[in-house]
């Protein structure tokens, strides 16, 4: 295929992505014509069909203008896909630490209150050690994946025994203190921990 034709295909793909990203729906064929410098709508249809065959676009035949950029299409454009759902990875203890299950069991939409959508996951809390700040047994916490934390952050931490726990993080002289938010429980004192992420949100199935 001539290089010019391939370049036009990439221009079409890029314009479709920009329009969907900005407006939530793809452009019309005539809008694509104007954006990429083509006068023939049939030529644009040809480029779209070839992009579909290459796996860069997909189309819902039951809906008009229902073009969607595929992961392969984003990759060829050099674009990292945005995370649109949060995977629920399992259970983490908010009392005695237990092993974290690293397989997604469900997916939840990202709340609009969380502007940065990248590297999020959810874990179900088991225990009552964080009840003073309203994290209850059975709640699901939204976690942003990161390896560092500031003193006072609520984190998901992995201990040297490969057990995960939700606590408030404090780095002190000679040790790490994982502080529960429950007046009846003592802190966990460790030489070192691995930070899996910072808690940035909360989801509760039942409010009564």
From Swiss-Prot:
For this chain's UniProt record, which GO biological process terms are given? DNA repair; DNA replication; negative regulation of DNA-templated transcription; proteolysis; SOS response
Active site residues per record: 129, 167
An example molecular function term from Gene Ontology annotations: DNA binding
Reaction catalysed by this enzyme: Hydrolysis of Ala-|-Gly bond in repressor LexA
Keywords assigned: Autocatalytic cleavage, DNA damage, DNA repair, DNA replication, DNA-binding, Hydrolase, Repressor, SOS response, Transcription, Transcription regulation
**What's the Enzyme Commission number for this chain?**
3.4.21.88
Q: How does it assemble?
A: Homodimer.
Query: What protein name applies here?
Result: LexA repressor
Per UniProt, what is the name of the gene that codes for the protein in this document? lexA
């Amino acid at each position: 295929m001539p290089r010019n034709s391939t370049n036009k295909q990439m221009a079409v793909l890029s314009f479709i992505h920009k329009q969907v990203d900005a407006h939530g729906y793809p452009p019309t064929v005539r809008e694509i014509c104007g954006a990429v410098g083509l006068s023939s709508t049939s030529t644009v249809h040809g480029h779209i069909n070839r992009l579909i065959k290459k796996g860069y676009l997909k189309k819902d035949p039951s809906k008009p203008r229902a073009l969607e950029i595929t992961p392969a299409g984003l990759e060829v454009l050099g674009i990292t896909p945005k995370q649109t759902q949060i995977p629920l990875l399992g259970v983490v203890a908010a009392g005695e630490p237990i092993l974290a299950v690293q397989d997604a069991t469900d997916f939840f939409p990202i709340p609009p209150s969380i502007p940065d959508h990248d590297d999020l996951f959810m874990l179900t809390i088991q225990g009552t050690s964080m009840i003073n700040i309203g994290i209850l047994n059975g709640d699901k916490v939204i976690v942003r994946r990161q390896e560092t934390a500031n003193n006072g952050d609520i984190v998901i931490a992995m201990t040297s025994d490969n057990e995960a726990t939700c606590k408030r993080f404090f780095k002190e002289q000679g040790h790490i203190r994982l502080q529960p938010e429950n007046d009846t429980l003592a802190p966990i004192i460790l030489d070192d921990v691995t930070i899996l992420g910072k808690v940035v949100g909360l989801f509760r199935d039942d409010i009564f």
